[in-house]
């Protein structure tokens, strides 16, 4: 049992921080209170304690050095929902070291946006040597993409317009729906079962509402296309990037969707991101949207997630909303808020101890715990 004493707690639940002790046992937060004791003690007097930071949209571990190490996109099939991030993530990627040293304890990582359907994202902790032991949620979402990326990557093959992108996604979902109907109608009769199709099997969890479509969409019209298609098929949806979200904030607030905003700490290298703004997270949050801030690592190095939140605060976002945008909101976004994202009894003991606000570049991360074990200390 471990007790962290006298730290100033920012639990991502209560707006105002408070001084308390944290009791940890078997990798879980056992209790938060005063006058707690354990065999092992960490003195956090004068320090700040936060939940481990969570990134809802990353590609960490899939984008290595040079072409031999790049596993982020399948370049020969525009529709490949059968791919799984867990089969490509390299836990030995040094980006994980940088991530946890900055307090990022959990990420949702997966395929890029070259394909209309790219495969499943996985939610993992940032410490470990074997991906199977790092998993929080094996299949967190099914990646789909709109806008420039599928067009650019497949322009000479099969996709040169936004209309084509939408049609390819619709066709895949229609085929998967028919496939599922045949499977359910056949029941246990193996002779009536449709021929096995790995791609269509991969889309069944989407149709059953077990995982959402994770829709890469920057431009406002692409965002609305993603919403339109999700509504047509009655499937769950999260919005990823949401670059022009500030232009349609009131409309997005009506949807109740989870939306991830970023990457913002980079050049506007594409036409569809020319309206990128640090004000976007704050505007969406103020409108009542459920907002997470993301790095899209390796577009932005994973360790700069708190800095991105700080830039959003500088542009007008409420600091408490910004904290929630890198803790409990991304945890809810990817469906793992029962385990991570806030400092509450029963959750994983993932926490960050700092000597100041994580939004300030002068702040030092003093200690990081994942599952109650120290993975970084200075």
Language model regions located:
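N-terminal metal-binding scaffold of metallo-dependent hydrolase/deaminase domains
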Residues: 1-37, 47-49
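C-terminal cap of metal-dependent C-N hydrolases
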Residues: 5-11, 332, 344-378
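Divalent metal-coordination and catalytic microenvironments
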Residues: 7, 22, 27, 46, ...
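His/Asp/Glu-enriched, well-ordered alpha-helical/loop segment
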Residues: 65-66, 70-75, 80, 212, ...
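Alpha-helical scaffold segments that flank or form the walls of functional sites
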Residues: 69-117, 127, 159-185, 189-191
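Active-site core of metal-dependent hydrolases
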Residues: 85, 180-277, 292, 332-334, ...
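Metal-coordinating catalytic core of metallo-dependent amide/deamination hydrolases
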Residues: 123-228, 232, 298
């Amino acid at each position: 049992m471990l007790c962290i004493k006298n730290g100033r707690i920012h639990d991502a639940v209560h707006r105002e921080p408070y001084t308390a002790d944290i009791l940890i046992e078997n990798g879980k937060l056992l209790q938060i209170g005063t006058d707690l004791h354990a065999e092992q003690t960490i003195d956090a007097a004068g320090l700040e304690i936060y939940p481990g930071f969570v990134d809802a949209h990353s590609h960490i571990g899939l984008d290595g050095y040079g072409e031999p190490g790049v596993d982020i996109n399948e370049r020969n099939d525009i529709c490949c929902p059968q791919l799984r991030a867990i089969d490509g993530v390299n836990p030995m990627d040094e980006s994980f070291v940088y991530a946890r040293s900055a307090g990022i304890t959990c990420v949702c990582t997966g395929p890029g946006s070259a394909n209309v359907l790219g495969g499943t994202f996985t939610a993992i902790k940032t410490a470990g040597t074997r991906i199977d032991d790092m998993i929080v949620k094996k299949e967190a979402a099914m990646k789909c993409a709109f806008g420039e990326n599928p067009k650019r990557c497949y322009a000479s093959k099969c996709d040169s317009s936004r209309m084509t992108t939408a049609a390819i996604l619709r066709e895949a979902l229609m085929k998967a729906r028919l496939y599922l109907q045949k499977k359910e109608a056949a029941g246990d009769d193996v002779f009536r079962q449709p021929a096995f199709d790995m791609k269509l099997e991969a889309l069944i969890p989407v149709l059953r509402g077990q995982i959402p479509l994770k829709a890469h969409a920057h431009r406002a019209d692409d965002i609305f296309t993603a919403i339109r298609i999700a509504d047509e098929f009655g499937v769950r949806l999260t919005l990823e990037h949401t670059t022009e979200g500030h232009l349609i904030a009131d409309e997005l607030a009506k949807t109740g969707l989870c939306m991830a905003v970023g990457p913002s700490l980079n050049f506007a290298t594409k036409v569809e991101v020319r309206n990128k703004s640090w004000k976007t997270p704050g505007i969406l949050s103020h409108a009542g949207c459920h907002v997470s801030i993301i790095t899209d690592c390796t577009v932005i190095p994973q360790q700069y997630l708190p800095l991105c939140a700080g830039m959003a605060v500088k542009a007008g976002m409420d600091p408490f909303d910004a904290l929630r945008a890198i803790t409990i909101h991304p945890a809810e976004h990817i469906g793992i808020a029962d385990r991570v994202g806030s400092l509450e009894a029963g959750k994983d003991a993932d926490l960050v101890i700092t000597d100041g606000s994580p939004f300030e570049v002068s702040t030092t991360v003093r200690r990081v715990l994942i599952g109650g074990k120290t993975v970084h200390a200075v």
